[in-house]
Each structure stands twice: as structure tokens, then as C-alpha cells.
Amino acid sequence: MSSNTGGSDRELRCSFCAKGQDEVKRLIAGPGVYICDECVALCNEIVAHEDAGEREEMDRLLTPAEIKARLDEYVIGQHQAKKILSVAVHNHYKRVFYAEALGGEVELEKSNILLIGPSGSGKTLLAKTLARVLKVPFAIADATTLTEAGYVGEDVENILVQLLQNADYDIEAAAKGIIYIDEIDKISRKGDGPSITRDVSGEGVQQALLKIIEGTEANIPPKGGRKHPQQEFIRMDTSNILFILGGAFIGLDKIVDQRSGGGSMGFGAKVSNRKDRPLGELLDQVHPNDLVKFGLIPEFIGRIPVVTHVDELGEEDLIRILTEPKNALVRQYQKLFELDKVTLRFTANALKSIASQAIERKTGARGLRNVMENVMLDIMYSLPTLEGVKECIINRAVVEKGREPVLIYDTEAKTGS
């Protein structure tokens, strides 16, 4: 392969390895460059190796300790719940990954999980973080919006539609995803006995959820159920979808306390003060019968073998949530200020006041953002118009009384009035 330019012969060479055209089988020309067949093969090998490495990292089954360590990066406290979740999730995906190797010798059941705990204690965050760590599609549903098919409200199949959409319509990926259903305690049946009227948003929803939670071939409408009745349905196997169900279950502790003797009545009965027994201790002792008495049907409870609880967050927990996780609120605001070349600092008392306000609102960790937004609104509104500010200090007076922050300039310190 030679090229004549202006009557002179010039040997062409690979722009990458510098081998001449006579040393290789083929030389491919580009705009001002050449690449030989050997370099093309080497590039393909490098790309294939990197892709295989990425797939291996993605497909490798994390150990329970590795899963918990990843959860620790984003979720403060709740160590027992994280340990139980890590083991359950590890066993679930072990069942998924090694299904063929197991054959028909032993049938491993799904490790669906029930998370009990007050609002703002981190139930949703735990489920979200698990999906992020495992790199699987994730969907959240609110149980209070669900009804039986044919009634006003969301069909349970719409949960699967959302998961499929979040998986970019990759049915294989969606079939190994995680679905978190919040407020599951709100679909408890009304009364202890079977209802003579149709309970379409309570026991009826539990019945509708049974099959997809256990594992079934579900027909789902890719565009949602009721607005597009003529669409073709997609079949999705839910056998390998991990379901995490969460709820506050207010009053469940009293049921446990009564069963375990704390609510004894009658002559000679030992009088026990409910306040003497911590909430966490009672929730550690939850039995399936307690959940039945609360209002979940036995068949539904049978599909959720793993039950754990998250503790109510105290002031110290909330302060740690503000500052320690990778996506901590304080870090987020500091990064925003850093883009304006300003250092943002919170005093210890300011953080304590923010946590205290969230506790007063009874919103837990979820309320921290709302408190922070209220505190930072005026500061973030005026800061871009101020020149020469190099540091902004948020103290207790800013949080509790709405005072201006301490602003430190390049040449002088100025304290807001």
C-alpha cells in the first residue's frame, strides 16, 4: 500500500504503533491519521476487558457486611435494621443469581421485608439506598392510593408499570428490581373478623398484592391501566422482585405489650407501666399474630418472612444526619456556597436548634430539609448580591430568631444586626 503525492513515494505508517504499511496486514485511513489492524484488535480487546470488568462488578453478589457498609455511608444509625436488611437482601439476590445452579433440589422462598417505624425514621431512604448499592431499578408506591381493580384509585399492577418505566422498559432488569410500598399499615382491614361489605382499599388491596409479592406472571399495561384500555399488555415475572413494605403501625406496640403480659388485667395481675418498656424493645417482639390483630391478613403476612423495625431518631441522630452522610444537607449547602467562593459554617448550637425544630414538628429526618430551607432562604437570596464575602457563619440566633448570619469579608468582619 503506497501513496504517490507530488510524484514522490511516502511510506504510510500507523499513527498509534508507528509500524509501516508493509509490516501489517491492513492500514485504515482517517482524516490525517492511519490505524493498523493490530491496533484495532488491541483496542477491541481493551474495551471488551473493561466492559467485562464493569459487568463483573455489577453482577458480583455483595456480602451482607459490604451491603451494610454501603448503607452506613448514607443512613445514620439503625444498625440492627441495616444488618437484618443486608442479610435478607444478600439471600434474596443469591437466590436470583444461583437459581439455575440450585435446580429443583431446594426451593428458596423470597425474602420480602416489612419495615416498621415512625415517619421520618429512614425507611424509604434505606430502600432507596439498597437499590442504589445493588444497581437495580427501584420504584416507590403509596399503599393508600391503591384499590382493587375496577374501583376508583390505582391498580396494584401500576406499581409494576412504574418499575418498568424506571428500568427504561428493560423487562429483564425490572424483573430483578426493588419495590418499596409505603404506608402499608393503612391498608389493614377494618375489624378483626371478615368483612360483610367490600373493603376495596384495605383487605381488598392486600388480596390484590398477594400474587405479585409472592411471585407471578403479571400482565401489565406499559402506559398505565385505565387511560389506555386498547394497549397491548407486557408479561412480567415478579418472582425475583424484592418487595420492601414500610409503615408506622401506630398502636402495634400496645398489641405486643398486651400479648406479652404488659396489659394484664384482673385480681392478682401484675401492674405494668407501658412507659417502662421502650418502643424498640416491644417492636423487637412482634409476632405474626400481632400483625393479624392489627389488621393484616394471614396470607399477606405469610409472604413477608423478614420483619424488622427502625428506631425513632433522637436529636443526636438528626445532627449526625445533617453532617455525616455523603449527601448530608450541610454538605450540600456548603457545596452551593463554595460555587460562589464562600465558606459556609454552622455552629454546634445552630445544628442542635435545627434538629430540635425537626423533632418538635414530629417529622424526623424528613423535616430537616424544611427547617434548613426556612433558615437559608433569606441568606441565599441576598448572598449573590454581596461582594467580598469569604465566610458565612450560621449560629443559634439565625435558626431560632431569624437574625442575620455572621459574614466575614476579605478585609473586615461584619456582623449582621
UniProtKB/Swiss-Prot annotation:
<dbReference type="Pfam" id="PF07724">
    <property type="entry name" value="AAA_2"/>
</dbReference>
<dbReference type="GO" id="GO:0051603">
    <property type="term" value="P:proteolysis involved in protein catabolic process"/>
</dbReference>
<feature type="binding site">
    <location>
        <position position="39"/>
    </location>
    <ligand>
        <name>Zn(2+)</name>
    </ligand>
</feature>
<keyword id="KW-0547">Nucleotide-binding</keyword>
<dbReference type="InterPro" id="IPR038366">
    <property type="entry name" value="Znf_CppX_C4_sf"/>
</dbReference>
<dbReference type="GO" id="GO:0051082">
    <property type="term" value="F:unfolded protein binding"/>
</dbReference>
<keyword id="KW-0862">Zinc</keyword>
<comment type="function">
    <text>ATP-dependent specificity component of the Clp protease. It directs the protease to specific substrates. Can perform chaperone functions in the absence of ClpP.</text>
</comment>
<dbReference type="GO" id="GO:0008270">
    <property type="term" value="F:zinc ion binding"/>
</dbReference>
<dbReference type="GO" id="GO:0051301">
    <property type="term" value="P:cell division"/>
</dbReference>
<feature type="binding site">
    <location>
        <position position="36"/>
    </location>
    <ligand>
        <name>Zn(2+)</name>
    </ligand>
</feature>
<feature type="binding site">
    <location>
        <begin position="118"/>
        <end position="125"/>
    </location>
    <ligand>
        <name>ATP</name>
    </ligand>
</feature>
<dbReference type="InterPro" id="IPR046425">
    <property type="entry name" value="ClpX_bact"/>
</dbReference>
<keyword id="KW-0143">Chaperone</keyword>
<dbReference type="InterPro" id="IPR010603">
    <property type="entry name" value="Znf_CppX_C4"/>
</dbReference>
<feature type="binding site">
    <location>
        <position position="17"/>
    </location>
    <ligand>
        <name>Zn(2+)</name>
    </ligand>
</feature>
<dbReference type="GO" id="GO:0009376">
    <property type="term" value="C:HslUV protease complex"/>
</dbReference>
<dbReference type="Pfam" id="PF06689">
    <property type="entry name" value="zf-C4_ClpX"/>
</dbReference>
<comment type="subunit">
    <text>Component of the ClpX-ClpP complex. Forms a hexameric ring that, in the presence of ATP, binds to fourteen ClpP subunits assembled into a disk-like structure with a central cavity, resembling the structure of eukaryotic proteasomes.</text>
</comment>
<protein>
    <recommendedName>
        <fullName>ATP-dependent Clp protease ATP-binding subunit ClpX</fullName>
    </recommendedName>
</protein>
<dbReference type="GO" id="GO:0140662">
    <property type="term" value="F:ATP-dependent protein folding chaperone"/>
</dbReference>
<dbReference type="InterPro" id="IPR019489">
    <property type="entry name" value="Clp_ATPase_C"/>
</dbReference>
<dbReference type="GO" id="GO:0005524">
    <property type="term" value="F:ATP binding"/>
</dbReference>
<feature type="domain" description="ClpX-type ZB">
    <location>
        <begin position="2"/>
        <end position="55"/>
    </location>
</feature>
<dbReference type="InterPro" id="IPR050052">
    <property type="entry name" value="ATP-dep_Clp_protease_ClpX"/>
</dbReference>
<dbReference type="Pfam" id="PF10431">
    <property type="entry name" value="ClpB_D2-small"/>
</dbReference>
<comment type="similarity">
    <text>Belongs to the ClpX chaperone family.</text>
</comment>
<dbReference type="InterPro" id="IPR003959">
    <property type="entry name" value="ATPase_AAA_core"/>
</dbReference>
<dbReference type="InterPro" id="IPR003593">
    <property type="entry name" value="AAA+_ATPase"/>
</dbReference>
<dbReference type="GO" id="GO:0016887">
    <property type="term" value="F:ATP hydrolysis activity"/>
</dbReference>
<dbReference type="InterPro" id="IPR004487">
    <property type="entry name" value="Clp_protease_ATP-bd_su_ClpX"/>
</dbReference>
<dbReference type="GO" id="GO:0046983">
    <property type="term" value="F:protein dimerization activity"/>
</dbReference>
<feature type="binding site">
    <location>
        <position position="14"/>
    </location>
    <ligand>
        <name>Zn(2+)</name>
    </ligand>
</feature>
<dbReference type="InterPro" id="IPR027417">
    <property type="entry name" value="P-loop_NTPase"/>
</dbReference>
<keyword id="KW-0067">ATP-binding</keyword>
<keyword id="KW-0479">Metal-binding</keyword>
